[in-house]
Amino acid sequence: MNTMYVMMAQILRSHLIKATVIPNRVKMLPYFGIIRNRMMSTHKSKKKIREYYRLLNVEEGCSADEVRESFHKLAKQYHPDSGSNTADSATFIRIEKAYRKVLSHVIEQTNASQSKGEEEEDVEKFKYKTPQHRHYLSFEGIGFGTPTQREKHYRQFRADRAAEQVMEYQKQKLQSQYFPDSVIVKNIRQSKQQKITQAIERLVEDLIQESMAKGDFDNLSGKGKPLKKFSDCSYIDPMTHNLNRILIDNGYQPEWILKQKEISDTIEQLREAILVSRKKLGNPMTPTEKKQWNHVCEQFQENIRKLNKRINDFNLIVPILTRQKVHFDAQKEIVRAQKIYETLIKTKEVTDRNPNNLDQGEGEKTPEIKKGFLNWMNLWKFIKIRSF
């Protein structure tokens, strides 16, 4: 009876083992199938992506701008409404699909690389770093490597330092033994230099006292008044005031003053040059002279443009807003030169109509000469007013 129970127990045990083990194996088969299907789908998707890249004529790893540019070129060729000989709606649909897939793939790769780079930066950021100023606290920070090696280097360093100190001591001892007067000579030189300096100061003081006794300082302007060391403005630093005074006394000027003078001289030269160019041409001008005049005006406009750039630089450095300058208008300057030329022509015509009459004697002027002189004076005043 016991034998039968034992056999039944063994049979039941075998059935239970099979019931627990075999289904797990059976369950594992679909899992391997899923992995295989996923690997195949991943392979197929990579193959499709490569096909999309090939269809768009771009390489893997390209940027989104390159993908868009390639799509625009292909769309111009295959779009049904493009009117080209290669227009094909089916091809364009495939190209558009490839464009969307490739663009999304490129964006995903870019985002993945950026996130990976940010993670690496965060890791590097929060990673513990030993401060650069922290050295080994033992052995005076001498040496490198293991503690034993650092100790060995430190011993060598101490031996070298001791040898140098001994050499320096022996050197000083020999110097004091064979050159006992060297320190005395050095002290004598310093004392002589000090005596010479004091002698010069005493000489200058004696000369000043002698001049005061003679009365050379009696009639000086500002006698009995406090020295005016600084300017009236209390906000200026005394050091700045002294530096400015030294620069002014030595002929130096601030940069903005030099630029202001340069701008004034340049515009005066340009006005004079265009007026001289207009005088060389006839009145009225021939077609050839008109071409020459147009060329002169173009060159004048270019010079005015360069001058306006210098005015911009001047306005940036000038310390006072009221000192800033406005741009010069080339057309207004050309019209001004024309008016001055016309005034000169009219003045010349008046002078030619009323020739000088010098028969009345020396030092006597006719009304015509006075009138011509007044016209020239008015013209000169007009030129000066227009230039400022």
From Swiss-Prot:
SMART domains: DnaJ
Residues in J domain copies: 51-115
Protein name: DnaJ homolog subfamily C member 28
Cited Gene3D superfamilies: DnaJ domain
InterPro entries from the UniProt entry: DnaJ_C_subfamily_28, DnaJ_domain, DnaJ_homolog_subfam-C_membr-28, J_dom_sf
Signal peptide extent: none
Coiled coil: 261-349
Pfam families xref list: DJC28_CD, DnaJ
Tissue expression from the record: Expressed in the fetal and adult brain, testis, uterus, spleen and liver.
Annotated keywords: Chaperone, Coiled coil, Phosphoprotein
PROSITE patterns: DNAJ_2
Domain of life: Eukaryota
Protein species of origin: Homo sapiens (Human)
Functional description taken from the UniProt entry: May have a role in protein folding or as a chaperone.
Residues found modified as Phosphothreonine: T347
Key word Coiled coil present: yes
